[in-house]
A protein has these predicted regions:
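Bacterial Sec-dependent N-terminal signal peptides
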Residues: 1-49, 584
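N-terminal periplasmic/intermembrane-space "pro-region" immediately following the signal or transit peptide
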Residues: 2-3, 14, 42-177, 188-192
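Exposed, low-structure sequence patches enriched in small/polar residues
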Residues: 45, 226, 328, 333-584
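Short loop/turn motifs that connect adjacent beta-strands in outer-membrane beta-barrel proteins
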Residues: 106, 143-145, 189-193, 236-239, ...
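Primarily recognizes Gram-negative and organellar outer-membrane beta-barrels
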Residues: 143-177, 204-227, 262-264, 279-285, ...
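Core alpha-helical transmembrane segments of integral membrane proteins
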Residues: 184, 191-198
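Outer membrane beta-barrel
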Residues: 194-195, 201, 205, 222-297, ...
Length: 584
């Protein structure tokens, strides 16, 4: 956020105490011991007999030997996690979600930590065969007990806008007007527990002229480049995986929006440790991902909004640390709870303070409230969110929400008294209505609020993804990594579609209110823009497969009312997004 004001009579922030330092270290050690504990139980479980000791009965760790259990069916075996389903292959991800709601795959994966992974027995071919029996994919080059080499599907993605930039969840594409395309593909190699996926992407962007304002938009040069894309190197350690990756990620239950991690921006190099399967315990099952990496900016490209432009030239690297934990209670079979927390700060400041390793490099383990550390004096940004997803098997439906804060609370009193400050949310509902075994109707609705609330009249928080401590905001290569509808925007989406295997025909309506609150010239006395920019989008969505070609297309007509907040400036924008997957 750009302006921070303490609540009236808010006590001054306390200096960091030695006890506070030990709290962060304690949290980190506890987490590491937890990982070692269930890893030990996994290894020892392989040598135990059928009889359980008192320890097994009390703790009853049942680490899933089948990492892709959520894709299980009565006649399919699940081995170790391997090839990824890239975030961006939204059609395959959507169909996996539909199969889970329909009860055709097990509900023990929250689907809130992606990318998802196939494996040696459930290959792309078998997964696609579950989706549609007519789809074939023969991608294996070498298949031996300890060696697997496979070709990855080739995807050719195209995007076109006719008036101004529009669209989201498009990875390496730039925020520009005109025609863009991306080609991706590669090879996957598995040797024992080592898994290497090389999936580079070639992208060519556009540079069409369009009407901008001093506040929104920027016409920037086009570029063409080869990027690492959806590549990774992974090594399995029982139920854990350590990895280096440039893959896009998606955290949270949303279909169109994720508050903290989506493929709205290009992926970035990160190092992670994560569970490679749902981990069953006496209290329920857990999944997690802990990661760290560096975010980048591109001096040749613009930002969506002037509030994200670096106001000060800063050549320091931005260090990024985040964690996502998903929990499915033992007593609530179809309910999933999630917690996500992220930090970013400049590396040149890490060595200039004496707060210790945990505070500087794994701050996701420090206390949640800011009165433990003097965060407002440190150039860094933290964001946190909680989520829930509830599957209704009999209704073949689900409800979900994500609620978060763009700024950490001062203390528990601050949390209780000013819940709306810096808050945002995503919530949605999805329902399937089956016509027969393979044909069904899909209904889904999703709403997101990322503009700050009217509480800013008392205590300005700025919109989501901006912060005075990190001048580039929550971005990578100048694009927001979280919510997709735009900076400070509110969004509602409604979709209805007919499905038959892979094939799909549907309609989507989206309503976007562009940054309705802001402290800029021209607003009225209560801080609400006198002229509101609103987009109304009407679209056709379709999927079709022919032999080894999987085609999906999204075509929308967007009517912008008061574009760039200019009265009676109402252009029409056409948007086309076509993704073609070539199988082997």
């Amino acid at each position: 956020m750009l302006i921070k004001k303490n609540i009236i009579n808010e006590p001054l922030m306390k200096k960091q105490s030695n006890g506070s330092k030990w709290n962060g270290i304690f949290y980190s050690l506890s987490f590491c011991l937890f990982l070692l504990f269930f890893s030990f139980n996994t290894i020892s479980a392989q040598d135990t007999s059928n009889s359980k000791s008192w320890k097994d009965k009390i703790i009853s760790w049942k680490i899933l030997k089948k990492p892709f259990d959520f894709l299980q069916s009565s006649n399919i075996k699940q081995p170790t996690a391997e090839m990824s389903i890239p975030v961006g292959f939204t059609d395959i991800e959507e169909l996996i979600r539909d199969l889970q709601l329909a009860g055709k795959i097990a509900p023990n994966n929250a689907l809130t930590i992606r990318p998802l992974y196939t494996n040696s027995d459930i290959t792309y071919n078998k997964l696609l065969n579950i989706i549609d029996a007519d789809i074939e994919n023969n991608n294996q080059l070498v298949s031996k007990p300890n060696l697997n080499i496979s070709l990855l599907p080739i995807n050719f993605t195209q995007k076109l806008t006719t008036h101004h930039p529009y669209g989201w969840n498009d990875g390496a594409f730039s925020l520009s007007k005109g025609y863009q395309f991306l080609i991706g593909g590669g090879v996957y190699l598995q040797w024992h527990k080592l898994k290497i996926q090389l999936r580079p992407e070639f992208v060519k962007t556009a540079s069409g002229n369009y009407e901008t304002s001093g506040y929104w938009g920027a016409v920037t040069p086009s570029f063409k480049k080869i990027m690492p894309g959806q590549s990774s190197i992974r090594y399995d350690l029982g139920p854990l995986t350590v990895a280096a990756s440039t893959e896009n990620m998606w955290w949270g239950p949303g279909i169109y929006n994720s508050m903290l991690m989506s493929n709205n921006a290009p992926g970035f190099l990160h190092y992670s440790i994560n569970s490679n399967r749902p981990i069953n315990t006496f209290a329920g099952s857990f999944q997690f991902q802990l990661q760290a990496g560096f975010l980048q900016k591109d001096s040749t490209q613009g930002y969506e909004n002037k509030r994200l432009y670096p106001a000060i030239i800063n050549n320091g690297k931005r260090y990024y640390n985040s964690i996502n934990v998903s929990y499915q209670p033992k007593f609530l079979k179809n309910v999933y709870f999630g917690l996500t927390r992220t930090f970013q700060n400049y590396t040149r400041l890490q060595s200039s303070n004496s707060n210790g390793f945990v505070y500087n490099y794994v701050p996701v383990f420090v206390a949640f409230f800011k009165n433990t550390y003097s965060d407002d004096t440190v150039k860094r940004d933290q964001v946190a969110a909680v989520s829930a997803r509830w599957i209704l098997p009999k209704e073949k439906a689900e409800m979900y929400f994500e609620f978060g804060f763009n700024d950490a609370k001062q203390n528990f009193r601050d949390l209780m008294m000013d819940m709306a400050h810096s808050s945002g949310y995503v919530w949605g509902f999805k329902k399937l209505k089956y016509i027969n075994e393979t044909k069904y109707l899909n209904f889904n609705i999703e709403m997101a609020r990322l503009a700050q609330t009217t509480r800013y009249l008392h205590r300005n928080a700025g919109n989501w993804y901006e912060h005075s401590g990190v001048i580039e905001g929550y971005t990578n290569l100048n694009q927001i990594m979280g919510g997709v509808s735009g900076f400070g925007n509110n969004m509602q989406a409604l979709a209805v579609s007919y499905h038959s295997g892979w094939n799909k025909l549907g309609f989507i309506f989206q309503h976007i209110v562009q940054n309705p609150y802001d402290l800029v010239a021209g607003i009225n006395e209560v801080g609400i823009r006198s002229i509101k920019w609103t987009d109304y989008s009407f679209g056709l969505q379709t999927r079709y497969h022919y032999k080894k070609i999987l085609l999906s297309a999204n075509m929308e007509v967007i009517k912008a009312k008061n574009y760039i907040w200019k009265k009676d400036n109402n252009p029409t924008n056409l948007f086309f997004y076509i993704n073609t997957i070539y199988l082997w």
